[in-house]
């Protein structure tokens, strides 16, 4: 039997973000979560409730553990390969009826918003010889048309967000950034999470090799890194 989880989310608002906008974002997450459930890639939501100050999300719990379990962290090479294989599996899914088909446009809109208020973090471009936020923004302006909407994404492809049972894929969680967009967003986060959660960048090349170098565009990968400066 599937376990049910209740999440209480306290919402803070500012002049540029209304409660209606946040509700819409949560409703979109429900839609894409239901879509992932239909494709047997996750379990989705049961219910979303809201009042004037807080939101409640009822979720089904996928049985298993994420990649942060000792069983997986203690075997980083296998973890790396498995992470890449599960990403390739996701990216090969048909996406014609996905409720979010314009992820790249949404992604760039968020970048523009954060850039306009100087919300930035250069840690995301340590591998790309970008030294200032101005350089990052200029690269985005010159290359942003490279981003495509041709792949079903998780959008936050990190070790805590994939559930396994003894190395067997069980499902994805936390799908608020999912949709049809550019695969290099997931590739960027896959490499990032290996470095962040394992504590070394030595598995970066192995991850890309296991995914398939023939499907990786280094310019688009750098573009995503620059976008995440303002993510």
Model-flagged regions — what are they?
Residues 1-3, 165:
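Active-site beta-strand termini and strand-to-loop segments that position acidic
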Residues 4-5, 119-125, 201-213, 230-231:
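ATP/Mg2+ or Mg2+-diphosphate-binding catalytic cores
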Residues 5-100:
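ATP-binding pocket architecture of kinase catalytic cores
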Residues 25, 228-231:
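Short hydrophobic/aromatic patches at helix-to-coil boundaries
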Residues 26, 61, 155-157, 175-177, ...:
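Generic detector of well-ordered alpha-helical packing
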Residues 32-35, 80-81, 85, 92-155, ...:
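An alpha-helical support segment within catalytic cores of ATP-dependent transferases
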Residues 149-152, 165-222, 226:
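Active-site Asp-x-Gly
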Residues 160-164:
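Hydrophobic residue at the +6 position relative to the catalytic HRD Asp in the kinase catalytic loop
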């Amino acid at each position: 039997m599937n376990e049910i989880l209740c999440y209480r989310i306290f919402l803070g608002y500012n002049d540029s973000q209304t409660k209606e906008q946040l509700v819409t974002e949560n409703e979109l997450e429900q839609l894409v979560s239901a879509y992932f459930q239909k494709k047997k890639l996750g379990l989705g939501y049961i219910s979303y409730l809201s009042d004037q100050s807080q939101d409640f999300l009822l979720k089904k719990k996928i049985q298993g553990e994420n990649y942060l379990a000792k069983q997986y962290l203690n075997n980083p090479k296998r973890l790396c390969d498995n992470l890449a294989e599960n990403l390739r599996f996701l990216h090969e899914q048909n996406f014609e009826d996905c409720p979010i088909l314009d992820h790249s446009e949404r992604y760039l809109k968020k970048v523009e918003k954060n850039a306009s208020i100087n919300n930035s973090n250069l840690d995301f471009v340590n591998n790309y010889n970008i030294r200032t936020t101005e350089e990052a923004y200029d690269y985005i302006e010159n290359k942003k048309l490279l981003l495509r909407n041709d792949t079903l994404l998780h959008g936050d492809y990190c070790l805590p967000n994939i559930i396994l049972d003894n190395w067997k894929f069980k499902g994805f969680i936390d799908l608020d950034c999912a949709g049809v967009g550019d695969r290099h967003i997931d590739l960027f986060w896959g490499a990032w999470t290996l470095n962040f959660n394992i504590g070394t960048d030595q598995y970066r090349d192995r991850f890309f090799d296991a995914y398939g170098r023939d499907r990786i565009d280094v310019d688009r990968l750098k573009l995503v890194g620059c976008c995440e400066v303002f993510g």
